[in-house]
């Protein structure tokens, strides 16, 4: 024991050796061992100065002060007469930092953590800090189930008291959950409870959410899910007594045991609201989601608290406090809720500010605002502004923040933080298709031209059956009241016979203009005028086509092709109802469009045409990761004043935007030709009718789709807002209400195309990607209900189309 005490004393003396117990006056200070640290910097860190009278305690404080700088591994203070000699050993300087073997932890994250701990190139190496970092990283690996992981800091000495620091990772494998046990449950089976966990001991192949890899954070979330499950079903005394996580000897397997006490179900005996209600007591009391006599429900209590905060927020109370205390009567198995409300101060809005809009001008964002500066704060108005910014589609994300104004008790700034997305689409391509042959396409569309909010588009397509060019321009705020103005010029040379449609060629050009009038937050009315010139040629004698020509006063030959041209002026109208939460990749809300046109006097044709589209997004979970999408489209058109609808105005279905899995525009009525020499013909030589597989379209259409939008497997959260996957079922039909089912067409095997019941159906999966070149859509679908003459196309790819 005496030897041990002597050893401890000698160790203490080794760091500070001073001769003489009495104080003395310091006349000089010398340093021995300084290399990187300047003498002046070392002197400034010492509490002792030349001329001071110092004691042993002062010298001990000097040693502690020098150690505290982090620059020294060893410090000794010696006395030579009235001179202090400070002998130091500097910590080595870090020359470089490298990493090896790290896969689960990215280098950027490691560098940030090292920087935060003061470990960086050019600084002194603190071995204690490095040891702490080693342990912290190992603890992180343990928290994600990698119990065999290790992290070692390798320090390599270099000349001039420098070192290389290398962190060597051995990550190992993640421990798999072998079994999860819930002990103490009586009302619900263990399988039912565990099915609500993210962590699983058995994961079916189709479950993209469940995970057998242990993670401490996920377990904590699952325990909270378990707690909420019971509290939402009346078990007010539910408790998680303990949780055991056991590791197998090889550190590759984990057993989890959760011990619970369910308790009994409790009913509500009453709800009492008190506190500073800011004069809105009647409204607040009416918000309660819980009623006496029903089972206690924790989720309803939380929703009630949130609704009270939202209500007060609408009246300018930006920071209300709402707390609910439960008064539990164990004898009667009842719970009384005491909701205490403190509305706090009412706030004005000093400024509305925007952050992150590097391209979009402030005015483009500000015109979407409903919260005015200088007015009372209204949380609903702030939220409306957020919804409108999301809906215009210029931003990936929009977040809001209400910030108190320093020095003011009743003013706040409302800050909208946006992350802009690429709103321009530039594409140029050369391709080859079995239908189109060699294809050239080019286009540029900018939805937010120069940050003004205007949309400008120029596009063109050239292939075996079409030459198309278009220029369009839309100003969504032509007036300050939100009246929009849009216009379009186009040219189209279309050879229908080369596109699996009935035989004709149409060279058309035209223009149109549209004014849009906002009716309210969600409704817009559009009106406009249009003009189009159609020059039709090489029209092969065909039953539906010839029926139209006769209606406009022509007497076409049954044995030769015809040419025809028209000039039409139209009144265009439309209505849009939009409650979608975002302009692209929405997850909630509805968008319904009604579009139509009718010819006006001066036109060669007389007809009307209308289409109704609707999309409904229903989120299935709180995070909007799973969303049900229902889509529908119906269209109808007909002639006026005894004239028929022009055949080139018919509806078509099939393709990536209607019924996937079928070739574009091939669903519906097929052409029946006169005297085309086909083997499928019937009738006399003069009026012989021949069936075909060429699509001709119809004057009525109905399309529907049910789609389940799912989280994209194996995709980083970073890309969650730019990639979408879904499973779908599509259905659709096109028919001709004026089809004349004659004996001749029956003899040629031509079906009755006036029936709407010939519905085609398909099922498949789709992937959408908001790429730097614009939206890309891939789909694979398998038709499971089709008819003779239909043309399948399982894999389809489209650029620049989203829904």
From Swiss-Prot:
Residues 1-20 form the signal peptide. The keyword Transport does not apply. GO terms for cellular component: Bam protein complex. It holds the Pfam family Omp85. Keywords: Cell outer membrane, Membrane, Repeat, Signal, Transmembrane, Transmembrane beta strand. GO terms for biological process: Gram-negative-bacterium-type cell outer membrane assembly; protein insertion into membrane. Its main location: membrane. Residues 24-91, 92-172, 175-263, 266-344, 347-421 form the POTRA domain. The keyword Signal applies. Coiled coil: none annotated. InterPro entries: Bac_surfAg_D15, BamA/TamA_POTRA, D15-like, OM_assembly_BamA, POTRA. It comes from the Bacteria. It is found in: Cell outer membrane. Part of the outer membrane protein assembly complex, which is involved in assembly and insertion of beta-barrel proteins into the outer membrane. Constitutes, with BamD, the core component of the assembly machinery. Belongs to the BamA family. Part of the Bam complex, which is composed of the outer membrane protein BamA, and four lipoproteins BamB, BamC, BamD and BamE. This is Outer membrane protein assembly factor BamA.
